UniProtKB/Swiss-Prot annotation:
Entry-linked InterPro entries: Alpha-glucan_binding_chloro
Any single biological process term in GO: regulation of starch metabolic process
The protein's name: Protein LIKE EARLY STARVATION, chloroplastic
Family, per entry: Belongs to the ESV1 family.
Region annotation (Disordered) ranges: 146-166, 187-206
Organism the protein comes from: Arabidopsis thaliana (Mouse-ear cress)
Tissue: Expressed ubiquitously.
Gene behind the chain: LESV
A GO CC term assigned to this protein in UniProt: cytosol
Length: 578
């Protein structure tokens, strides 16, 4: 046993030599101790032969393990001694510099006292606002992550795509039924979406840094070096959007009043799934707005005078202009222009930004962002962008917009929409509007403190489509929330087979609930299966002769979008600009 243990220790040390009776590997040692043990090879297990293993271990010479251990101990002692010396040196230096640090801090504090009280208060207010905004953003991010399944925009996953086998089953009975949430986070800082400096971290120059002498006096019509926009200055018709887009070109743009809040309306049941004139008018207005924004961006980028970098109007409004060119990580070159301004009394600060971007592989982009804030706590932001690109030889076009505003009292609203088209005929669109006010605000019957509206549609280009609408609201009633809503959706394949379904619901503050759901199964036979039920005991299930109607293709598709995007198609490639 001892002999076997000696062999194992020698093998672990790595200075071993094996002799199996056939081959012997030689190694020179100044002195060695031999351990011999009988070993049975694999062949001996079969009765063929046996062998002997010999282990030779050296403990002398220049590379013995005893010397290596001694060197390691010495090295460790030296390292500890060096660390003690270094600590002593730092301690001595710290004592010497303590007096210098105190004098330096005193000088810095004296410089702070030299700044006026008003300036210090202004900086502190900005810091408080920034920290509060960061805290709110973090809280919203947490809420969004917890409710990611409920607050997702557009179509949630590919399971909702139209297939050739859409039938009336319990599984698709819930298809398109969108979960309701209360808070939807807005798009935060513009740094991730727009080029150039960020508005929310900007502070206008103060005091002697800017004066009427330093600024170039300009006449009021040239206050902002842009041309009038005949589209945006048109009188709004009755069919226009209820939330007007801000425009720095309109006569009201620099009156610095917050756009009106979306009306708090009672949710009504959609009895018909055909597109209403309101929906068609809304989409038409969105297209006009997109075209007007594209014209404005192109006009600003082409007409601004590079020599004019700042100015002041007759009424004391001051503005600054900055331009730049950025290259994105994917090779896209972006050219942007930014105009910032502040009223004469310093109450309102705003920023308008425009940009165009392109590469040499077919990508083009136009965009604008308009932001503002005032001394009463009102803030607002309007973002718009359209782009076109090619993927596997197919042209894609995309349009998106995001309007958001919040008052100093905490009232908040947002409106977002997104559209995507490609040359194969596929298209997808969605929009989402919401608002919230202080829950202690008194309201008329049927109105709410929190209100949402979503709609979306998706076309596969072959005759299949999916559409949905979802409205819901919440009202604070003293010690709880009353909630109600209405939604419907439809899902059809190219063979006109599919399902239409909807639900109207209500939920009281004490958890009492009521709902009525309905559905229609279409199989292309000329008969429609209609069914439904309610929590109050209603129930129906019947088949009626009825033709199937649904939208196979969008009334505004890829070629309409392509023809209307004149300014976007005119954006030059980087190689054409040089």
């Amino acid at each position: 046993m001892a002999l076997r243990l000696g062999v194992s220790i020698g093998a672990a040390l790595g200075s071993s030599h094996w002799d199996d009776g056939q081959r012997v590997r030689q190694r020179d040692f100044s002195a060695s101790v031999n351990f011999t043990a009988p070993v049975t090879s694999r062949r001996s297990l079969r009765g063929s032969r046996t062998g002997v293993r010999i282990l030779r271990v050296s403990n002398e010479g220049r590379e013995s393990y005893l010397d290596m251990w001694k060197n390691a101990v010495d090295r460790e002692k030296k390292e500890k001694a060096f660390e003690k010396i270094a600590e002593n040196v730092v301690a001595v230096d710290g004592e010497k510099e303590k007096g210098g640090d105190l004098e330096k801090k005193s000088d810095e504090f004296q410089k702070i006292l030299e700044v006026s009280v008003e300036e210090r208060d202004r900086i502190q207010r900005m810091q408080v606002v920034d920290r509060a905004a960061a805290a709110i953003s973090a809280a919203r991010a947490i809420l969004a992550s917890n409710n990611s399944g409920d607050g997702k925009e557009g179509f949630p996953n590919e399971d909702n795509t139209v297939t050739s086998e859409v039938t009336e089953t319990p599984k698709n009975a819930k298809l398109g039924m969108w979960s309701r949430t209360v808070y939807v986070p807005r798009s935060e800082t513009s740094g991730t979406e727009t080029p150039g400096p960020d508005f929310w971290s900007w502070t206008p120059p103060q005091g002697s840094e800017i004066s009427s002498v330093d600024l170039q006096a300009v006449e009021k019509p040239a206050e902002f070096p842009t041309l009038p926009n005949p589209v945006l200055e048109k009188d709004k018709s009755a069919d226009s959007l209820s939330i007007p887009y801000e425009s720095m070109l309109s006569s009201e743009r620099h009156s610095f009043t917050i756009p009106p809040f979306e009306s708090l309306i009672e949710v009504r049941k959609e009895a018909e799934t055909k597109p209403s004139s309101e929906t068609l008018s809304t989409e038409h207005d969105l297209d006009l707005i997109s075209s007007a924004n594209a014209e404005e961006v192109a006009r600003v980028l082409d007409s601004l005078d590079e020599s004019s970098t700042h100015g002041v109007s007759e009424d004391g409004l001051k503005w600054w202009k900055q331009t730049g060119v950025e290259k994105r990580p994917d090779g896209v070159v972006c050219r942007w222009t930014m105009i910032r301004g502040v009223t004469a009394d310093g109450v309102v600060e705003w920023q308008d930004k425009y940009w165009e971007a392109s590469d040499d592989f077919g990508f083009k982009e136009l965009g604008s962002e308009k932001s503002g804030r005032d001394a009463t706590g009102n803030v607002w932001r309007e973002f718009w962008r359209e782009s076109m690109s090619q993927e596997n030889g197919v042209v894609h076009m995309e349009k998106t917009a995001d309007k958001w505003g919040k008052s100093g009292q905490g009232d908040e609203w947002q409106e977002k929409w997104w559209e995507h088209y490609d040359a194969t005929g596929k298209s997808e669109k969605w929009a989402h509007k919401w608002c919230s006010i202080d829950r202690n605000t008194p309201l008329d019957a049927g109105h709410a403190h929190v209100w949402h509206e979503r709609w979306g549609e998706k076309y596969d280009g072959q005759g299949g489509s999916t559409k949905y609408t979802d409205k819901w609201a919440e009202r604070w009633v003293g010690d709880g929330w009353d909630k109600w809503g209405d939604k419907w959706d439809e899902n059809f394949n190219p063979s006109a087979q599919g399902v239409k379904q909807g639900e109207t619901w209500w939920e009281g503050k004490h958890g009492d609930r009521w709902n009525r759901s309905w559905g229609e199964g279409h199989n292309g036979s000329g008969w429609v299966h209609k069914y439904g039920k309610s929590s109050s005991g209603e129930h129906w299930d019947t088949h009626v002769p009825q033709e199937t109607w649904y939208e196979k293709f969008p009334h505004f598709g890829f070629f309409h979008c392509f023809d209307n995007s004149v300014q976007l198609r005119a954006v030059k490639k980087p190689s054409d600009m040089s």
